[in-house]
């Protein structure tokens, strides 16, 4: 039982950094989505002004 417990501990530690990495990737994805939305809105406003 002790051996299984010891084996279970390292995976939990490895999972924590993976979660932080996923969070960082999600943040970067949100930033890219926000930038895309801004460019789309700016393009729409520009098109409206030109028309």
From Swiss-Prot:
State the residue spans of region: Disordered: 1-51
Highest taxon of the lineage: Viruses
Q: Where is the composition biased (Low complexity)?
A: 19-36
- Indicate what this protein is called per its UniProt record: Uncharacterized protein W
């Amino acid at each position: 039982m002790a051996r299984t417990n010891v084996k279970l501990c390292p995976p939990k530690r490895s999972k924590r950094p993976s979660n932080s990495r996923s969070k960082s990737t999600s943040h970067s994805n949100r930033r890219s989505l926000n930038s895309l939305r801004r460019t789309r809105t700016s393009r729409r406003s520009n098109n409206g002004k030109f028309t």
